[in-house]
A protein has these predicted regions:
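Cytosolic regulatory regions of ion transport systems
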Residues: 1-121
């Protein structure tokens, strides 16, 4: 399966989504900012983008289910949200969870709750 979930469409998330999409991967992006979702669709950097509060466990589980083997959590600036999303994705059964972190402490916490890889862009 080459389906990727990108959570967050800030600069880092847009760059990740665009790279995956250009390389023929199926990309679903989740973002709470409507303007960023519209831009992603308009610039054709994803297959689909959905406006969603990703910290809403019920909504996230409904959309993600078990359709993705890799998720990239690109919301490093909001530590609480990145931790919560990572934990939910792990509970859903996403095998590979790559998370953006802004510091070593955040990275350690993300690994404890389920991140398989932490990046510090």
């Amino acid at each position: 399966m080459s389906n990727y979930l990108v959570v967050g469409l800030g600069r880092f998330g847009r760059s990740v989504a665009k790279t995956l999409y250009k390389n023929g991967k199926t990309v679903l992006a989740l973002e709470q900012n409507e303007e960023l979702v519209q831009q992603a669709i308009e610039y054709q950097i994803v297959d689909e983008a959905i406006i969603l509060d990703v910290t809403d466990e019920k909504s996230l589980k409904k959309i993600v289910k078990d359709n993705f083997d890799t998720a990239i959590v690109c919301i490093g600036s909001d530590m609480q949200s990145s931790i919560l999303v990572t934990l939910i994705l792990k509970e859903i059964g996403v095998e590979n969870i790559i998370c953006k972190a802004t510091n070593q402490i955040q990275g350690k916490v993300l690994e404890k709750v389920g991140a398989t890889t932490v990046v510090y862009p």
